[in-house]
Amino acid sequence: MTHQTHSYHMVNPSPWPLTGALSALLMTSGLIMWFHFNSMLLLTLGLSTNILTMYQWWRDIIRESTFQGHHTPTVQKGLRYGMILFIVSEVLFFTGFFWAFYHSSLAPTPELGGCWPPTGIRPLNPLEVPLLNTSVLLASGVSITWAHHSLMEGNRKHMLQALFITIALGLYFTLLQASEYYEAPFTISDGIYGSTFFVATGFHGLHVIIGSTFLIVCFLRQVKFHFTSNHHFGFERAAWYWHFVDVVWLFLYVSIYWWGS
């Protein structure tokens, strides 16, 4: 093995990007199969492959960063820019959903009855479950900031407590969203209103699940003393992602639940 004289991480070839891409293909194809043919076989296979990929990819990253010391300040700087670009791409992703919503709602076509919400659609009350969901996510934003400050101050106990509260609030939000979907008086097939509502809020819900998974991994890593007050890159990126999810929900609440109703 040659001696490394630079601060960059020369990553070994990894199969996980390929298996991750294949699992994404299986999940999206499986979602179509579930919607149109009521078969969850492909979707279950895709989810299983995705969970296995996440586990093994996280295992490799933890080994490289925590135990082998490959995440030098130079590498962290590059990863930080990468995370910023990823969040920007997610902003553009949700911009498409908001564009579809406002395009349809600001000038409703005669087929919709010339009004918004369309004739026959009974929208959800924004002051009931959606307002509770807003409170839950805002509280989780406060608790993850508490966790971050506790970690920087070296207070491990408070960091674990705050992170546990954040995870619990994230899971509670997901349960509330699932119950709202179950009790909604309209479906995804109820025209443009149902489509924009369920796709926009559903993709946000998916991001909450991804963020919660990220935070659970950070919690387990903190239990095993992987983070220090100076080196906690993984947790910091998870906190960024969680704040992004918070902000997107505020736009969803104001646009779709409050103004759109």
From Swiss-Prot:
Residues 1-15, 67-72, 153-155, 224-232 are mitochondrial matrix. Residues 35-40, 106-128, 184-190, 257-261 are mitochondrial intermembrane. SUPFAM superfamilies: Cytochrome c oxidase subunit III-like. Signal peptide: none annotated. Component of the cytochrome c oxidase, the last enzyme in the mitochondrial electron transport chain which drives oxidative phosphorylation. The respiratory chain contains 3 multisubunit complexes succinate dehydrogenase (complex II, CII), ubiquinol-cytochrome c oxidoreductase (cytochrome b-c1 complex, complex III, CIII) and cytochrome c oxidase (complex IV, CIV), that cooperate to transfer electrons derived from NADH and succinate to molecular oxygen, creating an electrochemical gradient over the inner membrane that drives transmembrane transport and the ATP synthase. Keywords: Membrane, Mitochondrion, Mitochondrion inner membrane, Translocase, Transmembrane, Transmembrane helix. It comes from Balaenoptera physalus. The chain crosses the membrane at residues 16-34, 41-66, 73-105, 129-152, 156-183, 191-223, 233-256. It catalyses: 4 Fe(II)-[cytochrome c] + O2 + 8 H(+)(in) = 4 Fe(III)-[cytochrome c] + 2 H2O + 4 H(+)(out). GO terms for cellular component: mitochondrial inner membrane; respiratory chain complex IV. It is found in: Mitochondrion inner membrane. One of its GO terms (biological process) is mitochondrial electron transport, cytochrome c to oxygen. GO terms for molecular function: cytochrome-c oxidase activity. It is a multi-pass membrane protein. InterPro entries: Cyt_c/ubiquinol_Oxase_su3 (IPR024791), Cyt_c_oxase_su3_dom (IPR033945), Cyt_c_oxidase-like_su3 (IPR000298), Cyt_c_oxidase_su3-like_sf (IPR035973), Cyt_c_oxidase_su3_a-hlx (IPR013833). Component of the cytochrome c oxidase (complex IV, CIV), a multisubunit enzyme composed of 14 subunits. The complex is composed of a catalytic core of 3 subunits MT-CO1, MT-CO2 and MT-CO3, encoded in the mitochondrial DNA, and 11 supernumerary subunits COX4I, COX5A, COX5B, COX6A, COX6B, COX6C, COX7A, COX7B, COX7C, COX8 and NDUFA4, which are encoded in the nuclear genome. Its EC number is 7.1.1.9. This is Cytochrome c oxidase subunit 3. Belongs to the cytochrome c oxidase subunit 3 family.
